[in-house]
Amino acid sequence: XFEGRGGFGGRGGGDRGGRGXGGFGGG
């Protein structure tokens, strides 16, 4: 369940899809 968006212009990845980093992101 990787459905999350990045916060800082990056793709999110993770169960909750928290804040994203510079490139990837994820929670």
Curated annotation (Swiss-Prot):
Keyword Lyase among record annotations: no
Parts of the chain that traverse the membrane: none
Domain of life: Eukaryota
Catalytic EC class: transferase
Principal location class: nucleus
Compositionally biased region (Gly residues): 1-12
Keyword list, A-Z: Methylation, Methyltransferase, Nucleus, Ribonucleoprotein, RNA-binding, rRNA processing, S-adenosyl-L-methionine, Transferase
Localization: Nucleus, Nucleolus
EC number: 2.1.1.-
Catalytic activity: L-glutaminyl-[histone H2A] + S-adenosyl-L-methionine = N(5)-methyl-L-glutaminyl-[histone H2A] + S-adenosyl-L-homocysteine + H(+)
Modified residue annotations for Asymmetric dimethylarginine: R5, R11, R16, R19
GO molecular function, one term: methyltransferase activity
GO CC annotations, alphabetized: nucleolus; ribonucleoprotein complex
GO biological process: methylation; rRNA processing
Residue segments, region Disordered: 1-27
Quaternary structure note: Component of box C/D small nucleolar ribonucleoprotein (snoRNP) particles. It is associated with the U3, U8 and U13 small nuclear RNAs.
Role according to the record: S-adenosyl-L-methionine-dependent methyltransferase that has the ability to methylate both RNAs and proteins. Involved in pre-rRNA processing. Utilizes the methyl donor S-adenosyl-L-methionine to catalyze the site-specific 2'-hydroxyl methylation of ribose moieties in pre-ribosomal RNA. Site specificity is provided by a guide RNA that base pairs with the substrate. Methylation occurs at a characteristic distance from the sequence involved in base pairing with the guide RNA.
Family: Belongs to the methyltransferase superfamily. Fibrillarin family.
Name the UniProt record assigns to this protein: rRNA/tRNA 2'-O-methyltransferase fibrillarin
Biological source species: Physarum polycephalum (Slime mold)
